[in-house]
Amino acid sequence: MSITRRLLGKAALGLAGAALLMQGTALAADRPAPFDKPGVKIALVRYLSTGDFFQAYLSGVEAQANALGVDLRVLDSRQDAALQADMVDQAIALGVQGIIIQHGLTESMKDAAQRAVDAGIKVVAFDVNVENPKIPQIEQSDRDLARLALEQAVKDNGDAWKAGYVYVAGIAPLDRRNETWVDVKKKHSGISEVAMFGTLDNPIANSVANQARSVLQAHPDIKVMFAPYDEFAKGVKIAVDEAGLNKGIKIYSADISTSDIAAMREP
């Protein structure tokens, strides 16, 4: 089962509209089971947590948990795939009634997610494919995000330029964005990817900046950097600014936050 964030947005608007029609706070008894009683245990098992998007995501989960009287347990693996799988087992041992798996690698989360299902726990996967028909898959329109960014890149730079590309395989949203990048290169044969690099080592932006410095030195003819995750783009910008190339290289990204907009407005 796959649910896009656009559909979730419509559902959220519907819920917000319904809330406005209610007088005061809804009684717990009005909620569907098991939320008709406080203290439902839910675990949020995270793979990625660095950056404004993930901070906002966590704040949203915490706010919703508070509104429903949920006992929320947050387990953060900080990009350690084996640890994230262990944390699913920890959540099972805690006796939670629900688990949200946020990002991760299919190969490490598939079996862990199945163990949770076998234990009778409701599981939802956000931006990670656990290859399980019993688990709802929540995702955004990553291909469209990449397409819009790259259409702008072609509009700004024409259809012939040398590019650096920041990518880490195995992360579902990045893999979907990569599909669009591959398609765009096929459509515009003049676009040449001269360097591909990327890392999720913490701190992500600084780690990517270290890689980007070497890439810029090796490929001074790069005109465009496609970094379709804002922490990647922040790292590229650090390296580009340090090299004094901010006038000659354009950076295209996704997952834009307030701090990203501030960086975009810098001269």
Give residue ranges: language-model regions.
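A residue-level marker of the well-folded mature domains of exported/periplasmic proteins
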Residues: 3, 9, 27-267
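Twin-arginine (Tat) signal peptide motif
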Residues: 1-13, 18-24
